[in-house]
Swiss-Prot record:
Motif, 'HIGH' region: chain positions: 12-22
TM helices/strands, residue ranges: none
Chain span(s) of sequence motif 'KMSKS' region: 228-232
Record's cofactor remark: Binds 1 zinc ion per subunit.
HAMAP family noted in UniProt: Glu_Q_tRNA_synth
Gene (UniProt): gluQ
Binding-site positions, L-glutamate: 9-13, 45, 172, 190
Binding site for Zn(2+): 101, 103, 115, 119
Named cofactor requirement(s): Zn(2+)
Annotated protein name in UniProt: Glutamyl-Q tRNA(Asp) synthetase
GO-annotated cellular components: cytosol
GO biological processes: glutamyl-tRNA aminoacylation; tRNA modification
Amino acid sequence: MQERQYVGRFAPSPSGSLHFGSLIAALGSYLQARAQRGQWLVRIEDIDPPREVAGAADRILSALEHYGLLWDGQVIYQSQRHEAYRATLDLLHQQGLSYCCNCTRSRIQQLGGLYDGHCRHLNLGPQGAAIRLRQSTPVYAFHDRLQGELQADPALAREDFIIRRRDGLFAYNLAVVVDDHFQGVTEIVRGADLIEPTVRQIALYHQLQAPVPTYVHLPLALGANGSKLSKQNHAPALPDGDPRPTLVAALKFLRQPLPESWQDLDLSLLLSWAVAHWKLEDVPRREAISLDENTSAFSKEPW
């Protein structure tokens, strides 16, 4: 049987501009795809309007172009994919794999934060209710090509998780699985902050009888205070000057080799060199790395 062509992707949410932590995820997924002569797609995950920042999607795409991370095909926006999500919800409902739940957030918090299946057999209607996946074959562990075998919290793995929220918005776990399957993604390279929901996503792939991609979770970049570089923590946007020093800092973070005189290479040649010398096995097998652990390994630019 012929192997499927490699398809990777970068799927940011437009809740702010790209920062150094975002660049690590984008660069790692880009290099992994290009090193295997595969496709690299970009998808804007704009399914949560309250968290979105006006103009952020355009700034994200401009930053990727500025840093030479050019994608294949058209950019997909999740806000234009509602019909596909509704069709998937209908399919799961018809197969008895989902149900409506009117439990409040406060009730679930009183239970310790994990849902107890209270509405599983109540046959509630959809009005004002969330929709949950009926977990029939929970996934308790998965293999990560970088981190190795990863075990999930069994209670979290068994939970009937939400696939459509009470306010009518589609849940992240539903949208990401539907879109990755639609786009033919064969491997997902992303930050280690998304390890936890992976078993839920694999369970949903199984329920939909869809092929499960392989996973690579890259180490997160931690700031000086030990917190993850993120939009929520107000990480500064990527510099808009010469992109090469910042790319070199990201390559160092991923423990990739550098050409001796990278300053003499233009952006395109630097990225081509990085693709040719990319080794996933050299990326640290850790879930997080502090940017000040080895200051000589990082550019002095303020992230």
